[in-house]
Design a protein with these regions (language model features):
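Residues embedded in well-ordered regular secondary structure
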Residues: 132, 153, 165-170, 180-186, ...
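Cleavable N-terminal targeting peptides that direct proteins into the secretory/outer-membrane pathway or into
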Residues: 1-23, 68, 82-84
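Periplasmic N-terminal soluble interaction domains immediately after the signal peptide in Gram-negative
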Residues: 47-48, 53-111, 245-247, 257-259
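N-terminal periplasmic "start-of-domain" segments of outer-membrane beta-barrel proteins
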Residues: 48-57, 113-141, 167-171, 199-215, ...
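Transmembrane beta-barrel strand/turn architecture of Gram-negative outer membrane proteins
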Residues: 155-157, 171, 228-231, 241, ...
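N-terminal periplasmic accessory domains that precede
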Residues: 96-101, 111, 146-149, 172-175, ...
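Short, acidic, small-residue-rich periplasmic hinge/interaction motif at the N-terminus
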Residues: 29-32, 39-44, 73-82, 91-139, ...
Length: 523
């Protein structure tokens, strides 16, 4: 019996040692002694910590076998207050007390934004509603164009691309009274200078000679490389309109580009982005019935002719004495058809002649540096985008040099210059007789769009440069095929744009007294 009691005593002794736990406890208050509920208290370098309760107290239970008997650093933090740390000797068992008294962080409480003039100010001192957009979120969006990268980044900001072409313009609207009843866009400010972001459409029903029918222009905001942007502020309110007049009635988008690093020596960064685009789903098209109507082959607009599978097969019967068409490269001749025998269909071939896998690549290189008296940033961005429609593309090269010089304790000079060269071609897609998809979708399944341009010969007379389409399979003496061959739309009715643009902002800041700045800006 005595031996059993000894064993139980020894077992209880070791069990008590095993269950012994160390803890750190205490309170977190402000400088007036008021408790701070929800403050975080963490053992630095670990995930061990606790939050204060309603009375400002906390207790951290130290896991067994971790830091017992060691000196650790305890860190406490609370929104709007300066963080504080202290060294604590953790006992092997039992608890130790550590109290914290935090000071208000006056700087941290000030929400800084950029006003419509490009100056930094506290949000609560502005007469306008503002939203901030993180520049990192914009570049991570994967969008090729700066305007499109603003989508879903700020409340009440509506971003609508005008088309799917590479480099196509984008409409930006800030929700409000003006955007409900109108279509005006906000004013765009880049480094304190207003720029244009217009959206322009070409003519609507242009078939032969026009170069902008149904195609959209570029947006000037997309001349900016998103990787050069430091911050974006969206402003709406009376103060925005007061500064810029009626141009800011629909709000202001304020863009600030990056400055050079003031410390740490020269820094170089390189970034490459690459993506591919494909048509998500094709429009199903029938390949049972040939061109014509009432069960007979013909050159009418409809595709309710004879049943293709019931044809005899082989070559069509033609009349070589009648008008004919010769392709521009001389490899194809089409005579007047008198009897349709061929069972060939071209739905897939015609589709593939219009669409492709799009590709986007962007290379960005930046060099920045400086010291206490000067900073600099140089960047080069190279964007190349081929659209899902063949021959559509958008190429852009960006060069930027931003410098800042502190001439004295009171005078600072800042210069920001960005040069852009962009080149693009966008395809006509409007709902008109020259529209790309109208021509493609209306093409009969038994007509090959490949040979779209050539010479029409009739009665010994040659008509060169004729447009061949499914309703004018010989081209004809007229230049009007009624509905375009979609390959003609791609190859012959280009909407090309070449832009050279320089955006500059030069600023001198003079601070004669503390809290007073005199700014001279030109650009």
């Amino acid at each position: 019996m005595l031996n059993n009691l000894r064993i139980m005593f020894v077992f209880s002794f070791f069990l008590g040692i095993m269950n012994a736990q160390s803890s750190i406890e205490g309170s977190v208050t402000d400088s007036n002694g008021s408790p701070l509920a929800g403050a975080n208290v963490v053992v630095d370098g670990t995930s061990v910590g606790a939050a204060t309760g309603a009375d400002g107290t906390y207790q951290i239970n130290i896991p067994s076998g971790t830091v017992e008997g060691q000196t650790v650093t305890l860190v406490t933090s609370y929104i709007g207050y300066k963080s504080q740390s202290a060294n604590v000797d953790v006992p092997l068992s039992g608890s130790v007390t550590m109290n914290f008294s935090l000071e208000v962080d006056a700087i941290g409480l000030q929400a800084i934004s950029v006003t419509a003039l490009g100056f930094e100010a506290n949000r609560d001192q502005q007469g306008s509603t503002s939203s901030s957009i993180n520049a990192g979120d914009m570049t991570r969006s994967g969008e090729s164009l700066m305007a499109n990268s603003l989508a879903a980044k700020a409340s009440n900001v509506i971003v609508n691309p005008s088309a799917g072409d590479p480099g196509a313009s984008t409409s930006i609207k800030i929700r409000g009274a003006n955007t409900i009843s109108g279509s005006n866009q906000p004013l765009i400010i880049v480094d304190g200078m207003p720029i244009n972001n217009s959206t322009t459409y070409g003519g609507g029903n242009n078939i032969t000679g026009g170069r902008t029918g149904g195609a959209t222009s570029q947006s000037r905001i997309n001349d900016i490389n998103a990787n050069d942007i430091a911050s974006v502020e969206v402003l709406k309110g009376a103060s925005a309109a007061a500064l810029w007049g009626s141009r800011a009635a629909n709000g202001v988008v304020v863009i600030k580009t990056k400055d050079g690093a003031a410390a740490g020596g020269m820094k170089m960064t390189y970034k490459r982005t690459e993506s591919f685009d494909q048509v998500h789903e094709r429009i199903p098209m029938q390949d049972t019935w040939g061109q014509g109507r009432s069960g007979k082959w013909g050159t009418q607009a409809e595709s309710w002719g004879d049943k293709i599978s019931e044809r005899t097969g082989g070559a069509d019967v033609v009349d070589t004495s009648k008008p004919y068409f010769v392709s521009e490269d001389g490899t194809f001749t089409q005579y007047t058809i008198t009897e349709k025998n061929s069972k060939e269909t071209y739905v897939d071939k015609n589709w593939d002649a219009v669409f492709q896998t799009g590709r986007f690549t962007q290379d960005d290189f930046q060099v920045s540096g400086g010291d206490a008296t000067k900073t600099y940033l140089f960047s080069y961005g190279r964007l190349r985008q081929d659209g899902i429609i063949r021959d559509s593309f958008y190429d852009r090269d960006n060069f930027r040099l931003n410098t800042k010089f502190k001439l004295s304790d009171k005078v600072t000079m800042t210069s920001k210059a960005g040069y852009t060269y962009s080149n693009s071609n966008r395809i006509q897609q409007s709902s008109n007789t020259a529209g790309l998809l109208l021509g493609l979708l209306r093409t009969a399944p038994d007509f090959d769009n490949t040979h779209y341009r050539g010479t029409y010969v009739s009665g010994g007379t040659e008509y060169t440069g004729r447009h061949r389409a499914y309703r004018r399979y010989l081209g004809g003496s007229s230049t009007n095929p009624i509905y375009n061959n979609p390959i003609w739309t791609i190859k012959e009715q280009k909407s090309t744009t070449g832009i050279n643009r320089l955006i500059m902002s030069n600023e001198m800041n003079y601070s004669p007294l503390e809290g007073t700045d005199v700014v001279l800006r030109a650009g």
